[in-house]
């Protein structure tokens, strides 16, 4: 029996823990880099502003669709109260009064006005669709008919599903959980209903909206994370409104406006954070061991291929951007291409034109292959270089490092331009 087993430690459990820590070391920086690159806070602000303009139209469309179905008439008031009272936690009755008043007035809106409200609601759903697909790096837009069908389905079937859910749950609550010990179970189930509802909504959002295949496990994991963050944000926001009340102190009677915007902004940050999490789960590939894939030129062929397409397009007058390169460069993922372009931009080899295209900034006839090799950061390979431990002040290692560097300089003392021309002459 091994020493660890005698001490009560399971080697397999310890190995899994080490592997989990290693995965987190890779995943967290990858997630944060994508979070910053996709400008989640800016996207949430844009969606929050558009949501403020679309709140009443969307609620009006939902309730109008439910009015079409007579079976949902008894539940209309319950649904209206549910939507209004749970829209912003801790806001009191002021916002609820205004929203209820606005929704009541929409019942007398003429047909043309109703069509306009429906179009506004469609625009919000379209913006959400575009923002999520930007996170998933989907550059091919949906076909017009496909997109309209999706948005129409969300606006028409969504309220019907909500109404059906309310009807079914009401039947269960009042026919089954009416008396006896089941009342306590009913109370417990009701306390979990908002969280379960949030998980289901986030799951459908992450599973269906991206115009790309999303794995069930990834979408469900992101939905759980988003639902947890949403519950935490509700509790924090309620505490902030009831105890700190900065908005009310500054704005007085108008405080409901910034409070509403701030809450909607928090909500969209949660939604987009969950979406980024789901994307990163699918985009991050497991890091292989160095011994299995070692190559002294790792990363150089990919960077040269990107440079070659940009250089060739620049010479031929057909400027390149990320969307075009994703179509012509095979085997390079959107995240990999973005990583290559970021390196070239940061080191001044490329610049972005006023049209959003990429252009060469350096003289490739004087820049050598070693100059390109030297700018590739260690993080470009993933986390495996982080496993290399410094040799300290060993004289032998310094000598070896100096010899290897000189050897690389001599072997790579080639201008980049002829190499790129050679790449462009290769058959596709």
Swiss-Prot record:
GO cellular component: plasma membrane
Subcellular location, record wording: Cell inner membrane
Source species taxonomy: Bacteria, Pseudomonadati, Chlorobiota, Chlorobiia, Chlorobiales
Superkingdom to which the source organism belongs: Bacteria
PANTHER family: INNER MEMBRANE PROTEIN YHJD, UPF0761 MEMBRANE PROTEIN YIHY
Protein name (database record): UPF0761 membrane protein Ppha_1623
Membrane topology of the entry: Multi-pass membrane protein
Keyword flag Nucleotide-binding: no
First-listed, main subcellular location of the protein, grouped into a coarse class: membrane
Organism: Pelodictyon phaeoclathratiforme (strain DSM 5477 / BU-1)
Keyword Phosphoprotein (UniProt): no
InterPro entries given in the database record: UPF0761_bac (IPR023679), Virul_fac_BrkB (IPR017039)
Signal peptide: none
Transmembrane segments: 52-72, 108-128, 148-168, 189-209, 216-233, 252-272
Record key words, sorted: Cell inner membrane, Cell membrane, Membrane, Transmembrane, Transmembrane helix
Membership in a protein family: Belongs to the UPF0761 family.
């Amino acid at each position: 029996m091994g020493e660890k087993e005698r001490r009560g430690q399971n080697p397999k459990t310890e190995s899994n823990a080490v592997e989990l820590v290693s995965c987190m070391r890779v995943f967290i920086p990858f997630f944060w880099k994508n979070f910053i690159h996709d400008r989640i806070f800016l996207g949430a602000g844009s969606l929050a502003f558009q949501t403020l303009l679309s709140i009443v139209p969307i609620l009006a469309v939902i309730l109008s669709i439910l009015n079409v179905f007579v079976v949902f008439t008894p539940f209309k008031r319950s649904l209206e109260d549910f939507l209004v009272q749970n829209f912003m936690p801790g806001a009191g009755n002021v916002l609820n009064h205004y929203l209820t008043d606005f929704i009541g007035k929409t019942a007398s809106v003429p047909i043309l006005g109703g069509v306009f409200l429906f179009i506004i609601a469609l625009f919000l759903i379209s913006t959400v669709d575009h923002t999520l697909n930007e996170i998933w790096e989907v550059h091919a837009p949906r076909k017009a008919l496909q997109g309209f069908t999706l948005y129409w389905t969300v606006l028409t079937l969504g309220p019907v599903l909500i109404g059906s859910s309310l009807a079914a749950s009401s039947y269960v609550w009042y026919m089954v959980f009416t008396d006896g010990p089941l009342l306590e179970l009913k109370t417990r189930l009701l306390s979990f209903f908002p969280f379960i509802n949030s998980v289901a909504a986030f799951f459908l959002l992450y599973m269906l909206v991206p115009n790309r295949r999303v794995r069930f496990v990834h979408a469900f994991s992101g939905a759980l994370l988003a639902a947890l963050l949403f519950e935490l944000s509700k509790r924090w926001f309620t505490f902030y409104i009831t105890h700190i009340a900065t908005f009310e102190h500054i704005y007085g009677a108008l405080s409901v406006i910034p409070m509403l915007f701030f809450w909607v902004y928090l909500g969209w940050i949660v939604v987009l954070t969950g979406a980024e999490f789901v994307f990163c789960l699918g985009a991050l590939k497991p890091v292989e061991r160095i011994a299995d894939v070692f190559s002294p030129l790792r990363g150089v062929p990919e960077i040269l291929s990107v440079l070659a397409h940009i250089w060739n397009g620049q010479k031929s007058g057909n400027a390149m951007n990320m969307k075009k390169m994703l179509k012509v460069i095979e085997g390079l993922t959107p995240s990999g291409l973005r990583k290559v372009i970021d390196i070239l931009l940061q080191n001044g080899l490329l610049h972005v034109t006023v049209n959003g295209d990429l252009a060469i900034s350096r003289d490739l006839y004087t820049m050598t292959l070693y100059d390109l090799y030297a700018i590739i950061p260690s993080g470009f390979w993933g986390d495996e270089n982080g496993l290399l431990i410094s040799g300290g002040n060993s004289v032998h290692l310094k000598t070896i490092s100096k010899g290897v560097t000189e050897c690389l300089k001599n072997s790579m003392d080639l201008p980049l331009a002829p190499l790129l021309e050679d790449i462009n002459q290769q058959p596709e």
